[in-house]
Amino acid sequence: MESLSRAMVHYLRHNPNAPLDDAAYTSVNHIFEIFNINRCTLDNIINLPTDKQRLFLSPCHNFIRAASGHSRPVQLHLLGSPITSPSSVKYCTHGTTRKSLTLIEKEGLQKMRRHYIHFAKNKTSVKKGSDVIITLDVPKYLRAGMKLYRLDDGNIAASGNRDNVIKPIYFL
């Protein structure tokens, strides 16, 4: 089940031929065909006990998408809800490597090959292999007019400034 779940997530995130709408959803019927599964199997995959929820069904349960990490552009406001109150964010950190830290401290966090800058919702959500944690000053960031979104999986995403960068002045 776990390998099928990972294959579905990879397909929904990265397959350029996957028929996704602006919110990155595709029909569950399409998934049934592509992966030769039925509704019961899909429900079992969605409900796998894991520390990271990677797949989401639409409210009507007829569409499915990967939580985040898409290779093609997806409208951030359609992947989650805007965060307007700093008090609603308990944990907003970005995991990185010590090797990358010097450049980040100088230039800021960049989206790199992704479409958005991702932040973890808790310690277990921090990117594997991270040996440095950068914490975002959420009140200062929001006061500056920058936008944060809580994704469906609970993690947080930001586009940064017009250059897609979060400057070090917003780090704690």
Task: Give a label for each model feature.
Residues 1-117, 123-172:
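Conserved NAD+-utilizing ADP-ribose enzyme module
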